[in-house]
Amino acid sequence: MKICIEGIENNKIVKNILISGSKSESNRLLILQKLFDGINITNLSDSDDTHHLQHALSSNEAIINIGHAGTAMRFLTSYFALKDGREVILTGSERMQNRPIQILVNALRDLGATISYEAKEGYPPIRIKGTKITKDKVQINGNVSSQYISSLLLIASKLKNGLEIELIGKITSIPYINMTLSLMNQLGIETVFVNQIIKVKPLKQSKKQYVIVESDWSSASYFYSIVALSEIGSEIRLSSYKKESIQGDAILVSIYKHFGVETTFSGSTVVLKKVIQSNNKHLKLDLNKAPDIAQTIAVTSFGLGISCELLGLHTLKIKETDRLEALQKELTKLGAHISVTNNSLYLESNSILHANISIET
């Protein structure tokens, strides 16, 4: 399907928009809900990842296909490793079968899990034979995708003696680890995160909880970009958000000040308003703690004629697609001068915008 987008004469906008729940929070809570009775969740994400995870958790099939859903693949690997007596094959799309899983599999094997590869070593599909995991200490590199670490954390309190995870080296995406721990704490799971060590105490049963998932800050990034690219006075109101968010992408509030966007909170509504035209010529950001918003920031910078250097993006190359390569390809069509490495992006300022271009999405 092709959609043609045309400019408008009046570029000042005022809108109210309801955003669905955070995918990151939703997926973590769904695993915890399956492990503990009495957890009721509202405002779940309507993302494909969350739908795939919900289906997998309710399925009795021997082969579970999670499509492109990387979070589901990682979280379910630990979940099914814990299900004593259950054997499943976890698989996914062609792209998913080229996304590494070995670091997580090795950590689970170190704890006593039984997992094997059905095809290529280190990649899905994987065969998991659920068993009682009795070991309670494991090491894993800190600079890997935080989803590996969160996957282990989510099952940790169900182990007989809990779990101690030692993170080796520099830790990537700490906000996502803290998000996992915060949600666990809300459910009564005791955790301690000091220096490079995370300790989780065992818990047989959580207290009954009604949890409202905060709306997704990553989704909010697109509306930040729209406001930044619009006339002064443009305003978008988004629901429902928390001023003290546990989502790393809430850093948008401070980042988009560079683009002339002011953020205010009114109850659970966040108000984005274009207050000034940005006079920035260059923007340099380390997005190690929030890499998923890099693409939106790059597009905003390009639209405003601002050069930018974005660092800490190494996890984007192993997503559902190589996001850095895809961004470079599509922005170049529009006239951007952009270069990428394994962990960074550099965009030169440019006032030229090519028209009548087809963008792959």
Task: Enumerate the predicted regions with their spans.
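Short, structured segments at the rim of ligand-binding sites
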Residues: 1-361
